[in-house]
Regions:
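A generic local secondary-structure boundary/capping motif
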Residues: 83-85, 108-111, 135-137, 157-158, ...
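An acidic intrinsically disordered interaction segment
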Residues: 1-12, 110-119, 140-144
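Active-site cofactor/cluster-binding pocket
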Residues: 74-134
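Acidic active-site catalytic centers that drive phospho-/nucleotidyl reactions
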Residues: 31-33, 98, 123, 174
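Short alpha-helices
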Residues: 122-193
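Hydrophobic helix-and-loop "lid/oligomerization" segment in the mid-to-C-terminal part
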Residues: 3-28, 34-76, 85-93, 168, ...
Length: 345
């Protein structure tokens, strides 16, 4: 069942009612949309069954201020654990929000959930694989959080203020604070308007202040590394971050940054696109690449991510792959860039 919002919503309600425990997941290196959409979805679950057990599993810990806000709202629902080692004893319904498959939550690409766990998906990315039996995929939406809003509204569930705020965080994060091109831009504005009508303009600006203010020094030290490692070409630019870079910059191994290297450099010069390569914190042979278009619809980056085994949006995409060192990782990306676009680094 796909892309029929009323049918999907009703079937999801039925599945939750018949489940013992709901398992949600944050994808690797969770961004604001991953966090906001999953926390916002708790509003839906609590309206269906306020007593059902619910866990949110994340291999990577969110940034400190976000993590504390989640703990304050949800108690112990968020558990920092690798999904492949988590004990799915009572968990019989897994809901993937903002990613298409369980492999996006762990570094083990062969990991699968136990067979008795049913799955459902709420996503705004283009699928490279067959989606689960129950799914709502809407690629015109710029964020998964906006889909969570739609599902709550379809069910006529009133959004609690705290959950509504996490939904707005997800929307703002994936839209670049409403700066990215969005086919449903007016709808995004209407969701914000709804929040302001219910809770006041000042509370909306408090969300902005929370997301933009009081960044720790380590965040700026990471940005300095990305800028120091910047390489600019006529058609594109790229940067990188290794674990040694982090250590030399005085950034702890456990620090969870919010800066995306590609987003940081996306407006440089006459670049058509940019990318960043980062080393995994736990697996030194695993690297992640993030692509960002600098020209909107006039230059799409998703094909490069797909070529490297990933996916995403036309204008923002990513992948992860193995390499012996950062130079090899960058060269693999540059080779892909050349094969698909004719550019050489």
């Amino acid at each position: 069942m796909a892309n029929n919002l009323p049918e999907f919503t009703q079937e999801l309600i039925n599945q939750i009612k018949n489940s013992k425990q709901i398992i949600l997941f944050l994808h690797l290196s969770p961004d604001l949309d991953s966090i906001g959409s999953n926390i916002g979805f708790l509003n839906f679950i609590e309206n269906v069954n306020p007593t059902i057990k619910t866990k949110i599993i994340s291999k990577d810990e969110p940034s400190e201020n976000i993590y504390l806000k989640i703990k304050e709202l949800t108690g112990n629902k968020l558990e920092i654990a690798d999904p492949q080692s988590y004990k799915y004893e009572e968990g019989d319904l897994a809901i993937f929000i903002d990613f298409p498959e369980i492999q996006r939550t762990t570094t083990n690409k062969d990991f699968k959930l136990p067979e008795y766990v049913k799955t459902a998906t709420i996503d705004h990315h283009v699928f490279e694989t067959e989606p689960p039996f129950l799914n709502y995929i809407e690629t015109k939406n710029l964020s998964a959080a906006s889909l969570v809003y739609e599902i709550n509204r379809q069910a006529n569930f009133v959004l609690k203020k705290d959950y509504f705020e996490f939904i707005l965080m997800g929307m703002l994060g994936d839209s670049g604070f409403l700066k990215h091109r969005d086919q449903k831009f007016v709808q995004s504005l209407s969701i914000i308007q709804k929040y302001c009508e219910e809770f006041g303009n000042e509370n909306y600006f408090k969300i902005i202040d929370f997301l933009e203010s009081h960044k720790p020094l380590e965040e700026y030290n990471l940005q300095k590394v990305y800028l120091n490692n910047l390489v600019y070409k006529n058609n594109f630019a790229y940067t990188s971050m290794t674990n040694n870079d982090r250590k030399n910059a005085g950034v702890s191994h456990t620090f969870s940054e919010t800066t995306n290297g590609a987003s940081l450099i996306r407006n440089i010069g006459e670049s058509k696109f940019v990318f960043s390569v980062t080393q995994d914190l736990d697996d030194e042979n695993l690297y992640r690449v993030s692509f960002r278009s600098c020209l909107g619809e006039n230059f799409q980056v998703r094909d490069m991510a797909v070529k490297l085994g990933g996916g995403g949006h036309l204008l923002a995409a990513g992948a992860q792959f193995e390499a012996s060192n950062v130079e090899s990782a960058i060269n693999l990306v540059l080779q892909t860039v050349h094969e698909l676009n004719g550019f050489w680094g």
